[in-house]
């Protein structure tokens, strides 16, 4: 009996020790798995937009007149007229952002954009082509969230030398103070202000880049819009210029407007992200023609300098006709009498042109 109790006690003691060991071992002696840290979320890289590939570009400059609300109607081409109402040049993509400009043969003696002040509009149409000669404006339209053509006054010529805007009559630098003294006064301190003093450009890109507008009424249905808005998606394959005479009669003594001679810098730029930005009043918009939005990262696809000469002011025809014919004679190296006779004996003008923009 005594032996049995001793064995039972020893057995109970062993159980207690075993339980104690197990209990002690459960208080942290067993290695625990190290928790994996939560990975830090990485910013998603901005996808690189598709690049626009082109080989050549045919450009048409078409003279016209204003039909209101941004609509331009082309003038009919009058046979026999010295003055070219349609002007053409070609751009060739030489790679690396370099472009060669070649004027059509009939303009080889006057290789520059011949423009007028006094209300005339000048449409400019770009037709891009690939190496096989196929038109690719539709490709640029598909990529239009990232591409825009800008137009401004060049501050340097093709050699990199400083180039000032000059008055064609005097061949001297433009007197910018004529604009500031005019009524209303026009500021001309910055390049942006000077560009706006010399010309205006209106974008007229269409959903189908090859669509030819048939009149003023259908323009609003065919213009290219920013998705989800009625704001214009500005590319620059179609648009028109108006050259301004805001310094006309600047001294209230009948002084003429200055006729600007300058290089128009045409730049196709690509944005890293979407080119649209939010305006406080107008919502999502595109940049103005003379100023790429600074908050957006841009790269230049190509840049070309187009020589422009404003050869005369049509407004002078009404009040100062001798001045107008003298200016035209200077541009074409004729006498004023020859220029006037050419205008009177050439095919008369009419308003039947099918060209609308």
What are these language model-derived features?
Residues 1-12:
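Bacterial N-terminal signal peptides that target proteins for export
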Residues 14, 18-57:
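Bacterial Sec-dependent N-terminal signal peptides
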Residues 41-83, 356-357:
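N-terminal segment immediately downstream of the Sec signal-peptide cleavage site
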Residues 75-117:
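N-terminal edge beta-strand
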Residues 108-201:
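Extracellular-facing segments of soluble proteins and assemblies that are Gly/Ser/Thr-biased and enriched
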Residues 122-128, 233-292:
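Internal, hydrophobic beta-strand segments that form the core of beta-sheet-rich folds
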Residues 170-250:
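Extended, solvent-exposed segments with strong compositional bias
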Residues 278-357:
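Short beta-strand elements
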């Amino acid at each position: 009996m005594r032996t049995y109790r001793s064995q039972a006690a020893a057995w109970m003691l062993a159980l207690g020790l075993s339980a104690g060991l197990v209990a002690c071992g459960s208080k942290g002696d067993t290695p625990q798995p190290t928790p994996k840290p939560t990975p830090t979320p990485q910013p998603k890289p901005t996808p690189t937009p598709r690049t626009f590939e082109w080989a050549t570009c045919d450009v048409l400059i078409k003279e016209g007149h204003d039909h209101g609300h941004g609509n331009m109607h082309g003038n009919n081409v009058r046979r026999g007229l010295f003055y070219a109402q349609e002007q053409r040049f070609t751009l060739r993509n030489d790679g690396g952002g370099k472009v060669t400009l070649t004027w059509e043969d009939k303009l080889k003696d006057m290789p520059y954009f011949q423009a007028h002040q006094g209300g005339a509009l000048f449409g400019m149409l770009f037709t891009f082509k690939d190496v096989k000669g196929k038109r690719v404006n539709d490709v640029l339209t598909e990529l239009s969230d990232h591409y825009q053509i800008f137009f401004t006054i060049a501050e340097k010529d093709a050699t990199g030398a400083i180039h000032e805007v000059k008055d064609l009559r005097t061949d001297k630098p433009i007197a910018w103070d004529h604009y500031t003294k005019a009524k209303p006064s026009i500021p001309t301190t910055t390049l942006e202000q000077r560009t706006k003093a010399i010309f205006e450009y209106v974008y007229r890109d269409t959903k189908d880049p090859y669509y030819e507008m048939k009149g003023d009424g259908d323009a609003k249905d065919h213009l290219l819009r920013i998705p989800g808005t009625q704001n214009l998606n500005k590319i620059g394959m179609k648009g028109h210029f108006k050259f301004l005479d805001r310094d006309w009669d600047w001294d209230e003594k009948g002084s003429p407007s200055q006729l600007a001679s300058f290089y128009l810098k045409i730049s196709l730029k690509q944005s890293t992200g979407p080119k649209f930005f939010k305006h406080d009043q107008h919502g999502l918009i595109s940049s103005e023609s003379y100023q790429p939005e600074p908050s957006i990262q841009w790269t230049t696809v190509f840049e070309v300098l187009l020589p422009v000469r404003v050869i005369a002011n049509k407004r002078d025809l009404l009040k100062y006709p001798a001045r107008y014919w003298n200016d035209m004679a200077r541009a074409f190296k004729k006498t004023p009498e020859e220029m006037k006779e050419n205008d009177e004996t050439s095919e008369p003008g009419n308003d039947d042109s099918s060209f609308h923009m």
